[in-house]
């Protein structure tokens, strides 16, 4: 008899797991509380402006392409992606700008401010990150390893210690090889992909730089939600039964097994396996009602990553100095990270990510206008949450900074504005305390590891998404879904022997 898989949540991790399980011959039902598939890969349109509500950068497209190839199909028949050789522009408080290109040589050619020594050091750093990327690909990515002990067993103690560079933090690894202060800050902010601090995260995450340089940075034509739509179409073609607007209220358990889910309609649906794309702690807390002692232990070890104050601005002018992806850096990177990740306050001078897809895709704003998305990282929801007044002051701080750094009269030109706070993120995606990127990567607390993909309490419960390994970001959460499918397939194959 065909076994039944229930997937809770239709984010990229959930939909990719559903696709792989269906491709493997299982009966798969996916329940998503919202009316769209993609989770944080969401869309907002108003007054002629289009905005990606969630992720705005596509990297490592081969991870997505694999899902289509398993069905002997081509992703290009479902969605169009475009490579962006000019990856982003960095603005610094003293007026310095640095353009990051795909390729160290190209970056050197486009930045007269960078010396020969700067480029040599940047190449040296890329070589270092390549070594880390290659070894993590062998075990962490290809085999879905979940713990330090598994990595040591797979690679051997000395090989793991040296090549994963567990001795240093990410920023220490950068500062050891890069002397240019602008490059130090720019490279450190690659940690944005996982919503953590480069001063706390382990050096193994330096691989993010090599991933982007080697695999490229891509734009999904028409908006990144089209990628989620493509995966949904593939899932339906493979026989996945998708229920949107369907909220799971709890997971039923018996001893060390999960037996099914209770929907908000009262209906009970049985399952042989459950895959939760809801974050691990909210799943245990709200769907299983795990005891307080075990929850507290998990919360200490797996603290949420950062959240964000997200502004979607329709602007009645154009700023020619902006690229597609932009970063407006802080005067003091260490202080910014300290305030967000340790003091848990709204930062005085935040580093701001600004995406302006209209630079590449003119369908995203009316002629002569621009669609600007602004995202500074801020703490996840605290026991004493930030107030409406706190957020209003922070909004002014953001606009003051952007105007000071070259976006002249930005306030005057805003004709449309939509804002998301951590509370909105928590409400819409049931994320842990409104975190965007799952679990924080911290060398001391968790060695940069997220939750394991297999539940430690229930033998047929699995997790996908940003709160489990291999981590946050679109390719990683998509990969987590594929890895969970591999684990279930391997388990079933073993049981049949």
Swiss-Prot record:
GO terms for molecular function: oxidoreductase activity. Its cofactor is FAD. It is an enzyme of class 1 (oxidoreductase). Keywords: Carotenoid biosynthesis, FAD, Flavoprotein, Oxidoreductase, Virulence. InterPro entries: Amino_oxidase (IPR002937), Carotenoid/retinoid_OxRdtase (IPR014105), FAD/NAD-bd_sf (IPR036188). GO terms for biological process: carotenoid biosynthetic process. FAD binds at residues 7-19. It catalyses: all-trans-4,4'-diaponeurosporene + 2 AH2 + 2 O2 = 4,4'-diaponeurosporenal + 2 A + 3 H2O. Pathway: Carotenoid biosynthesis; staphyloxanthin biosynthesis; staphyloxanthin from farnesyl diphosphate: step 3/5. Its EC number is 1.14.99.-. Belongs to the carotenoid/retinoid oxidoreductase family. CrtP subfamily. Involved in the biosynthesis of the yellow-orange carotenoid staphyloxanthin, which plays a role in the virulence via its protective function against oxidative stress. Catalyzes the oxidation of the terminal methyl side group of 4,4'-diaponeurosporene to form 4,4'-diaponeurosporen-4-al. Upon coexpression with Methylomonas 4,4'-diapophytoene desaturase (CrtN), CrtP produces 4,4'-diapolycopene dialdehyde, thus accepting 4,4'-diapolycopene as substrate. This is 4,4'-diaponeurosporene oxygenase. The lineage of its organism: Bacteria, Bacillati, Bacillota, Bacilli, Bacillales.
């Amino acid at each position: 008899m065909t076994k039944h898989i229930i997937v809770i949540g239709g984010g990229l991790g959930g939909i990719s797991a559903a696709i792989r399980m269906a491709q493997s011959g299982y009966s798969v039902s996916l329940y998503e509380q919202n009316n769209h598939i993609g989770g944080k890969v969401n869309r907002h349109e108003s007054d002629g402006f289009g905005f990606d509500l969630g992720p705005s950068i596509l990297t490592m497209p081969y991870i997505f392409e694999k899902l289509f190839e398993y069905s002997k199909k081509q992703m290009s028949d479902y969605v169009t992606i475009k490579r962006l050789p000019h990856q982003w522009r960095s603005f610094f408080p003293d007026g310095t700008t640095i353009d990051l290109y795909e390729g160290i040589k190209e970056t050197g050619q486009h930045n007269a401010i960078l010396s020969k020594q700067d480029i040599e050091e940047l190449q040296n750093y890329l070589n270092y990150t390549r070594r880390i990327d290659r070894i993590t690909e062998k075990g962490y990515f290809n085999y879905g390893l979940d713990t330090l002990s598994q990595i040591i067993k797979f690679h051997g103690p000395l090989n793991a210690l040296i090549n994963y560079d567990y001795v240093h933090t990410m920023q220490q690894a950068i500062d050891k090889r890069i002397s240019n202060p602008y490059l130090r800050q720019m490279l450190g902010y690659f940690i944005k992909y996982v919503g953590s601090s480069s001063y706390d995260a382990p050096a193994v995450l330096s691989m993010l730089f090599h991933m982007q340089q080697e695999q490229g940075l891509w734009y999904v034509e028409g908006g990144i939600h089209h990628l989620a739509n493509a995966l949904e179409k593939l899932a339906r073609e493979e026989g996945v039964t998708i229920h949107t607007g369907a909220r799971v209220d709890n997971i039923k358990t018996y001893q060390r097994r999960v037996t099914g889910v209770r929907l908000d309609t009262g209906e009970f649906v049985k399952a042989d396996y459950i895959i939760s794309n809801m974050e691990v702690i909210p799943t245990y807390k709200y769907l299983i009602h795990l005891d307080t002692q075990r929850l507290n232990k998990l919360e200490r070890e797996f603290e949420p990553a950062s959240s964000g104050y997200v502004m979607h601005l329709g602007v009645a002018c154009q700023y020619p100095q902006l690229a597609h992806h932009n970063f407006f850096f802080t005067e003091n990177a260490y202080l910014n990270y300290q305030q967000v990740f340790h003091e848990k306050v709204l930062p005085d001078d935040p580093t701001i990510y600004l995406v302006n897809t209209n630079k590449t895709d003119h369908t995203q704003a009316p002629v002569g206008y621009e669609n600007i998305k602004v995202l500074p990282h801020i703490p996840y929801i605290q026991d004493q949450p930030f107030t409406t007044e706190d957020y209003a002051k922070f909004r002014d701080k953001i606009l003051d900074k952007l105007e000071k750094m070259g976006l002249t009269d930005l306030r005057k030109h805003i004709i449309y504005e939509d804002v998301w706070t951590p509370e909105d993120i928590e409400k819409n995606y049931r994320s842990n305390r409104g975190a965007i990127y799952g679990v924080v990567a911290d060398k001391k607390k968790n060695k940069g590891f997220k939750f394991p993909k297999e539940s430690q309490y229930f033998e047929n419960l699995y997790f996908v998404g940003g709160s489990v390994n291999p981590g946050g970001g679109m390719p990683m959460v998509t990969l987590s879904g594929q890895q969970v499918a591999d684990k279930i397939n391997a388990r079933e194959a073993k049981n049949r022997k």
